[in-house]
Amino acid sequence: MKKYLLSIAALLLCLLAHSQEADDLGNYAEFSIIPRLDVNPLFGAEPEFTLGNSSLYTLFEGSASEHFSWTVASHWISWYYPDEFGLETGALYKGLGYSDSNNLFDFLKADLSFGNWTFTLGKDCITTGGHEYDDWDWLVHPQLASPLWNDLACYQWGGKVAWTTPSEMTTLSLQMTTSPFGERPFGSGLYTYSAQWSGDYDWYSPLWSVSAFGREGSEFGSAPRDYSFLVSLGNQFLLGDWTVTLDWTNTAGLNDEYSDFLAGNTFHGSVDYAPSDRWDFSLLGNYILPKKGGPVNWWNAGVIAHFFPLRDSQDLRIHAFAEYDSLLGGFELCAGILYNLTFNLW
C-alpha cells in the first residue's frame, strides 16, 4: 500500500509540474472557521440533556490551477455531553495514527484533474455511496443519521481515480483506502476497495457503490484476512423546490466489537422542501431491519427547519428539529446555531 501511495504521489507531482505551466484559472484559497452550538434535551425512559453536534471545525480548500486542488477539513472540538468536553475532544487527538476511529483530520487530500479524469490522493471519505454523505459533518444532525453514518470510521488514507463522461452526467470511481477494521492505517495490512457510480440525470441522481472492507479473519474462517461487503444504493429525485432521497444499505450497523457489519437492511429517507434561499424544511428518518438473530427492528423520524438570516448568504444557520426514536422510547428536541466564517486568502 505504501508503494502504491508513493507511486501515485510521484505521478501527481509530475502532473502538477505540468499543470503549473497552464493558466491560472481557478487559482484561489479559502480558510473557514465553523463553530456550532446545539442544545439537545431527550425525553424518554432515561431523560438527559446533551449538546448535540456542538463542535468546532476548520476548512482549508483551494486550487493552484484549473488542474490541481486541495481540501483539508479538521475537527478540533467535539462536545456532546456537557461534563465531558475534555474527554470527547481529547479522543480526536488521541485517534491520530489510528484507522479504527475518526480523528482530528477528516479530509487531507489533493485532487488532480485532466480532461475527464480526476486523481485523488490523501485522506478522503470511503466511497460508500448514499446521499447521506453529501453534506459536511458540521451540517449534519447525527441523531437523525443512519447507524452506518454514526459508527463507521469513514475517513481513511488512500487513492481514487474517477472518470466523468463528456456530458458530465455520469462519474465512475475506483478507490483503495486503509480499512476502518484495522487499528493502524498501514501497519494492519487491511484495506478497503470501492467502486461507485454517480449520476446527474436532470430529475434523478443515483449514487450507488459496493465496497469490500478488509478485516481480520473470523474465528469461524480459515483465512487470516476476510472481507465484509457493503452495498449502498442512493437515489435522489429533484422535483422543483422538493427533493426526495432514499438510501439503502445492506447493513444494520456495526457490532459491539467493531469487527464486522451487522447483517440486515437500513433505509434512510428524506423529503426536503426549500421555498427560498433563507428557509428549508425536511422530513427525515431511518428504518433499521436486522436479519434473524440480530437486534430488534427500530426506527426514528423527525422534522427539521433551517433558517438563514443573512441576506444573500447561508454562512449563518439557525436550526431546530424534533425527533422520535423507537430505540430510546421517547422524543428529543434540538435547537442550535452554526456560523461559517470564511477568509479569502487569494
Where are the model-predicted features located?
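Detector for outer-membrane/organellar transmembrane beta-barrel domains
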Residues: 169, 193-292, 299
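Repeated loop/turn-to-beta-strand initiation elements of outer-membrane beta-barrel proteins
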Residues: 66-70, 116-119, 167-172, 201-208, ...
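Outer-membrane beta-barrel biogenesis signature
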Residues: 5, 17-35, 47, 125-127, ...
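Transmembrane beta-barrel strands of outer-membrane/channel proteins
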Residues: 31-41, 72-76, 121-123, 172-178, ...
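Surface-exposed coil loops of outer-membrane beta-barrel proteins
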Residues: 31-44, 85-104, 118-196, 335, ...
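Gram-negative outer-membrane beta-barrel proteins
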Residues: 39-47, 78-84, 127-131, 167, ...
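Outer-membrane beta-barrel "beta-signal"
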Residues: 303-309, 330-346
